[in-house]
Every structure is written in C-alpha cells, then in structure tokens.
Swiss-Prot record:
Region (Interaction with BBS1, BBS2, BBS4, BBS7, BBS8 and BBS9): 530-598
Any GO CC annotation of this UniProt entry: cytoplasm
Entry keywords, A to Z: Calmodulin-binding, Cilium biogenesis/degradation, Coiled coil, Cytoplasm, Cytoskeleton, Repeat
Principal subcellular localisation of the protein: cytoplasm
Start and end residues of each IQ domain: 294-317, 318-338, 387-416, 417-437
Species this protein is from: Mus musculus (Mouse)
Gene: Iqcb1
Protein name: IQ calmodulin-binding motif-containing protein 1
CDD domains listed in its UniProt record: IQCD (cd23767)
Subunit structure: Interacts with calmodulin. Interacts with CEP290/NPHP6; IQCB1/NPHP5 and CEP290/NPHP6; are proposed to form a functional NPHP5-6 module localized to the centrosome. Interacts with ATXN10. Interacts with NPHP1, INVS, NPHP4 and RPGRIP1L; these interactions likely require additional interactors. Associates with the BBSome complex; interacts with BBS1, BBS2, BBS4, BBS5, BBS7, BBS8 and BBS9.
Cellular compartments annotated: Cytoplasm, Cytoskeleton, Microtubule organizing center, Centrosome
Interaction with BBS1, BBS8 and BBS9, as annotated region: 1-157
C-alpha cells in the first residue's frame, strides 16, 4: 500500500524509472543521493523519504542493478559504488512497517551478500589491472563498497553473523594483495569493534578459517600494516572472549603459536600489542618437566608416524597422482557446470522478476487509463465489478486448494475403502463358490406328497375363487363398437393437438414480436436527439397492420383538425370514418420494411 503524502521528488523519480529503458535505470537511481543529501540528517523528514523509497521498490531496483555485470551499466564501477552508498544509507534508519519480515529476512541479507560479491569482483579487476591509475580507481571503489558495507552493518548488527559466515568474505580475507588485504582487515577490525559476540555464533569451521587467516597474515605477510592489524585483531578477540583464548592455548591446530610469536621481530609500531598477545597465550601455571616429556613423546610418535605415512605415500604415489589429477579435473568440471547453472538460474530469476514488475506496472497503467476513460458515475460500478472478479478468483483458488487438501487427507481412507471393497468382493465370490459346490453335492430328498384331505382343501379354495371372480364375456358387436369409439377419440385427440401446436407457435411469434417492439421503443432516442431517420425503424413488415396503423393515424388527425361544432354530438369512444381514396393514396407511398418497391 502506497503511503499518503508521498514526496513528489520520489514520486517523479519512480515514474521515470518505470518509464525508462533498462540501461538508463542506474543513472536515474543516482538522483536518490541528491535527495538524501538535501534532507536534514536524523530528521523525521529523512525517515519519511526512506519509507517512500522503500514503498516504491527503488531499493529493490538498486539491488537488481548491483547484481548485474558492471560492463552493462552506464558509468561502470563509479555508478555501482555510488549505488552501494545510496543503498546502505536508505537501509539504515528505515522503518519498513508492515513488510518488516521481508525487509529484515530477505532484503538486508541480500544487500550484504551483494556488497561482498561486488568486493570480490573489484578484487579480481584490481589484480588483473595493469595500469597504476586504473588500480587506484578500483581501490577507491573497493574502499567505497567496504565503507558502505560497514555502514550497513552498523545500522543492522544482526547481519554481522551472515557476513562472517559468507564464503565471499573469506575469499576477500584470503587475498595476497597488500592494499586489498589491509582494507579487508580494517573492515574486520571495525566489525568486531561494533559487536564481537557474533563471532562465537558462527560455525566452528568458519571461525577456524578466520583465525587461521589472521595468524597467517601475522606470521607470513611482510606488510607491517597488515601484521599490526592482525595483531590488534587477535588481541581484541583473546581479551574479549575466553573461548577463543582457550582455543589458541590448548588446540592442537595452534600448537607452537607462542614460540612463533616470540620469534617475530619487535617493531616499534605494534611490539606492545604483540607482547600483550604473547603474555595472554602463555599459561600462568604449567609443569615444565611434564611438558618436556610430553613434547619428546609427541616428537617420537610424530617421527614414527610421519615415517610410516611417508613410506606409505611413496608406495601409492604413482596411482595417487593419477587419481588426484582425475579428481581435480572432475571437481573443476563440476564447479564450472555448477557456476554456469547458478549463473543461468540467476539470469532467469532476474529476467522473470523484471518481467513480473513490468507486467505489474503495465497492469497498473492500464487500470489508471481505464479509470480515466470511464464516466465518473460508472467508476464505483467498475470498482465493484473488479472487486467481484478478484473475489471470484480468490475463491476459485481457495476452493481448489481446499479440495486438493481434502483429497490428500482422504486418500488413505479412500485407499482403505477400495481395499475393503476388493476384499469383500473376493470373499463373496469365494462364499458363492462354496455354496454352489454344496448345492451340487447335496442329496436329493424328493417332493413332499400331498394328502387326500389337503388336495380336497386346495380344490375347494380354487372353486370358491372362480365363483367370486367370474370372467366377463363380451359379444363381437360390442367389441367392434368399443374399438370404433377408441379410434374416433384418438383421431380427435391428434387433430386437436396439431391445432394447439399451431396456436402455440403463433403465440410465441407474437410474444417475440412484442418483445422486439418493446426493445426498439426502449432504445428510441428522445425528441431532442431524433434526426428524422428513426420513424423508419418502427414501420411494420405486414401490409394489413401498416394499413390499420395509417387509418388510425389519419382518423386522429382528422378528428383533431375538425371544427369544434362537428364534435358536439360525439362520444369519446366513437370512431371517425376515413375515405378509402385518401387511405389508398397514402398507402401507395408508404415504405414497408423488408419489401421492394414496385
């Protein structure tokens, strides 16, 4: 439902987006930045503008544009980076109202995922770029996208868990480029400063991957900026979460971490943070002797195990290489097929979504045009008809859904009923066969003989019945007379039925003619609108009827035009005679519909 009192700038912009072709939509959406910047920050007017932008689906248009290829968008990465800023500013501080569930569960996660995908695309373009100016521009656009993502996460903290669990974020974190890596590490540090508790809510595999990447950058990256940021991140995590500190201390994955950190060169930039981290990872109480024994035993076990594994691996090396190559090629083929399938599905989904939006827009425009064409007095009737049609459609779908649901619920009982009928039929057939066999093999007992007394009694009953009901006898002459009367009555009935049928057909024809005449009279225009051709529609095809009508018309005219002294002795019901010559002359010029003039 569109809000009342919509900002005219948003309204005109939405109309322009709806009417413009697809390639011009991104540039038109950039006008939202000027509207947002001209509105006072933190005011109720800004909230109202954001609500209008959301209600007119402009945020969804921005998401659709961000999911497209940058080469197809006018302005390229510059337009895309500005759209990310617009999208993040519109989503932060927005109150969706009734559509809150869709906004928080679908739109916001989709926006964060699109930002990460854009970051990966920019990372790829930055690595493939050869010119320094191009790399500087791409790095600037990447920084804008990360800032927009951080702004979005600052307004919606629940998205931090989705971002940290995303594979795209992990790929961004695993980059070898110093500049991109520094930006991503700074983004991660800012995210954890907002709310680091979401890091413990993610899956264990994702948490280990993030910690491994931070430790890798701390121990292997030559850049002091990245190493300093990684040290600060580990220090913040270890100080704020006891679980992560225990994991870094006791987990077998991070064994020897303290010794590696002690070997790091103490730079003046982050030596203090590094020393604090080493102090946190060193346990206050531990038994050095037992640890040394355990260490020696572990080294011995590892040596034997590694030797066994090495010998086993050397034996399987030729076949393992072939299997590895085969599995790598098959995995790569599957990945390519999966990527192509996902891309095709995404393109199809976007195409269908655009088609649905375009169809909805055309439907709304046609409805508005129809309302403009309809007379104001018929608008309420038109709306009522549309409501009835909509109600009928809803009822049809609801009844279909209800019947399908009832059928699914009744299917087990129907199956049981059919099975019971089948069993009953089989049992009845079996019992009938059994009875038939019994009758075939039953012994013959013979008929019971009648006694003399019983035979006399039955003969007396038959004689009494014959006496009470004597048969009627008719002579041949009486029979012929009765037959002649029946034939006469039958002939009379058939003749009367034919006459009645003709009379009924005549009555139906007269009723149809009367209905046609009434319909013509109802559709006849008023005297003010008549043009002179209308009387021809009321001429009869029957000459007697036309003559009678003409005679009545002339009688009325003659009576009206007669002087008053001729009307003194007349009664209201008296008829006036008309000469036949006047009637015949006029009839000669009378047009009879359906006939040709002589």
């Amino acid at each position: 439902m569109k809000p009342a009192g919509t900002d005219p700038r948003i309204l005109s912009l939405a109309a322009e987006v709806a009417k413009s072709p697809e390639q011009n939509v991104p540039v038109i959406l950039l006008k939202l930045k000027e509207i947002i910047n001209n509105t006072p920050l933190g005011s109720s007017e800004l909230k109202k503008v954001k609500q209008d932008i959301y209600c007119y689906d402009l945020i969804q248009y921005c998401l659709l544009v961000l999911s497209q290829d940058s080469s197809r968008i006018q302005g390229g990465w510059s337009t895309i980076s500005q759209l990310t800023q617009i999208l993040s500013h519109c989503c932060v501080g927005l109150e969706p109202g009734e559509d809150g569930e869709e906004f928080y569960k679908e739109l916001l996660p989709s926006a964060a995922e699109n930002f990460l995908i854009l970051g990966r695309r920019l990372q790829t373009c930055f690595i493939n770029a050869t010119k320094g100016e191009e790399q500087d521009k791409l790095l600037h656009f990447f920084q804008i996208v990360t800032d927009s993502l951080f702004w979005l996460l600052g307004g919606h903290v629940q998205l931090i868990q989705n971002v940290l669990q995303s594979d795209h974020f992990l790929h961004l974190l695993q980059t070898d480029n110093v500049q991109i890596g520094a930006s991503v590490m700074t983004l991660l540090q800012n995210i954890l400063q907002i709310n680091s508790g979401n890091l413990l809510k993610i899956e264990g595999k994702a948490l280990h991957s993030i910690l491994d990447e931070i430790l890798f950058k701390l121990l292997s990256t030559p850049s002091p900026v990245i190493r300093s940021t990684a040290t600060k991140l580990l220090l913040v995590l270890a100080e704020s979460h006891q679980e992560i500190l225990i994991l870094l201390r006791l987990s077998a994955c991070y064994k020897g971490l303290r010794s590696l950190l002690n070997k790091q060169e103490t730079l003046t930039e982050f030596s203090r943070e590094l020393r604090q981290l080493v102090d946190l990872l060193t346990p206050k109480i531990h038994q050095e002797v037992e640890e040394q024994k355990l260490h020696k035993a572990a080294c011995l076990i590892q040596a034997y195990w590694k030797g066994f594994q090495t010998r086993k691996r050397l034996k399987k090396l030729p076949s393992a290489v072939i299997a590895l190559q085969r599995s790598f090629r098959s995995k790569r083929t599957k990945m390519m097929l999966e990527l192509n399938r996902q891309k095709e599905e995404e393109d199809l989904r976007l195409k269908l979504q655009l088609q649905r939006q375009r169809a909805m827009r055309l439907s709304r425009e046609s409805r508005l045009n129809m309302l403009e064409i309809i007379h104001p007095g018929q608008v309420e009737k038109y709306n009522r008809e549309m409501e009835e049609k909509s109600a009928l459609t809803i009822q049809k779908h609801w009844r279909g859904y209800r019947e399908r649901k009832n059928f699914r619920q009744q299917r087990p009982s129907l199956t049981e009923y059919k099975a019971a009928v089948t069993l009953q039929r089989a049992v009845l057939k079996f019992l009938a066969k059994c009875r038939k066999k019994k009758k075939l093999f039953a012994s013959w007992h013979g008929l019971q003989e009648l006694t003399d007394a019983r035979r006399v009694e039955l003969k007396q009953q038959v004689d009494d019945y014959v006496k009470r009901h004597p048969c009627s006898q008719m002579s041949e002459a009486a029979s012929r007379e009765l037959h002649a009367q029946a034939q006469e009555r039958l002939q009379h009935y058939f003749m009367g039925r034919a006459i009645e049928e003709r009379a009924q057909q005549h009555r139906e024809a007269l009723m149809a003619q009367i209905s046609t005449n009434i319909e013509q009279l109802m559709k006849a225009p008023s005297l003010k609108e008549a043009e002179g051709k209308e009387p021809e529609q009321f001429l009869s095809r029957s000459r007697p009827v036309a003559a009678k009508a003409k005679q009545a018309h002339l009688t009325t005219l003659k009576h009206i035009q007669a002087p008053w002294w001729k009307k003194l002795g007349e009664e209201p019901g008296d008829e006036v005679d008309v000469p036949k010559d006047e009637l015949s002359i006029d009839l000669g010029m009378l047009f009879i519909g359906g006939t040709k003039p002589p």
